[in-house]
Amino acid sequence: LPERDRRARLSLRRPARASRRFHPGPALPQKRGAGYARSRQVYSGQNRPRHRRRGIYRQRALPPGPHAGLQKAHCARFHENGLFEINEELKPRFGSDRYQIVLASIRDRERLESVFEDYRPDIVFHAAAHKHVPMMEINPCEAVKNNVFGTKNVLECCIAYKVKRCILISTDKAVNTTNVMGATKRVAELLVQSLNGHGCEFAAVRFGNVLGSNGSVVHTFQRQIDQGGPVTVTHRDITRYFMTIPEAVSLVLSAGALAKGGEIFVLDMGSPVKIYDLATDMIRLSGYEPGRDIKIEITGLRPGEKCFEELVQADESIDTTSHEKIFVMKSEPVNSSLVLDSVYSLHQVLEQDDEQAVRTALFSLVQRDMHRKTAE
């Protein structure tokens, strides 16, 4: 609490103790804006050798996508402004002869084929996606163009250029989705399963929010705190799963090593975090008292937003793997012909440039039973 010197009219604040409501490890660091991540020791001991299995270690990798936090840890942020910055970070650490930065769009099939032709990757980590839920709600055509048909371009290039393995970075928002972004990622998962078995091992990794990535709630809250508030939360009871950037990268690489083709992996995300509690903790970590120094404002759920996210659908179950933090989905195999025909129909609707029609076709696709038993 503030201690006031009445004569000098100064306010002194003691740093608040880190709350452990969402942080099971050591106290959260006091660094402004970037230090609110859990420490789960994912790089210690037994996790490292897992990346060396089944051809992951020392392979030529192509990680397309602007998934800023995750991609920066993998290799680079693939958008124009970030390319220069990440190149400056990588050069002194690795030397410019160990990597190559390429500017390209996954929607540009000709350019994408040129990149695959030039670099002949052994493994692809596909993280390219438009990922902001409210933005995609008002831009459904762009979401489908990028997240569905951009993904289709990547997968087909993997087959054409004999890539050994391709890992799609998916999201828990693909489960029982109520928003455009999640629906497009669910279609991407179906494409991964449908195109598997054509010479490339395709798999997907599904997880929640990445703490510290660009555009994350942590950055938003810190900016609002720096501005004096209010800190905005859409619902008092809203929860989300969170993972640190190093943890996410480690587990994605490990899942890639486990992949044999056709799997959807689910990561151990721990317990869901109440966003209101996260806001309260961050305010206190900044040396303020919630509700008095910095107010928390409940703004209401945004279009497409759910109060809680799920990791599996009703017709799915999970099984363990050799990695204690990685699980694999168990469900009926998909009907590949049905999926590809449905995606083709979606493309025909997309060409009409009718946003409502695209939205309707998209949700009709993800709500349809795409398993082989449908055709039996």
What positions do the PLM features span?
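N-terminal Rossmann NAD(P)H-binding glycine-rich loop of SDR-like oxidoreductase domains
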Residues: 48-66
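Helix N-cap at the beta1-alpha1 junction of Rossmann-like dinucleotide-binding domains, i.e.
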Residues: 79-82, 271
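Proline-aspartate-enriched helix->loop->beta-strand connector
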Residues: 70-71, 116-125, 133, 163
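Conserved residues in the N-terminal Rossmann fold of short-chain dehydrogenase/reductase
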Residues: 102-103, 145, 235, 298
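Conserved Rossmann-fold cofactor-binding substructure of NAD(P)-dependent oxidoreductases
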Residues: 102-123
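Flexible, Lys/Arg-rich cytosolic regulatory linkers and terminal tails that connect or flank
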Residues: 1-47, 159
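Strand-loop microenvironment adjacent to phosphate/nucleotide-handling motifs in alpha/beta enzyme folds
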Residues: 33, 37-42, 154, 189-210, ...
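Conserved Rossmann-fold NAD(P)-dependent oxidoreductase catalytic core, especially the SDR/UDP-sugar
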Residues: 9-13, 126, 130-186, 194-195
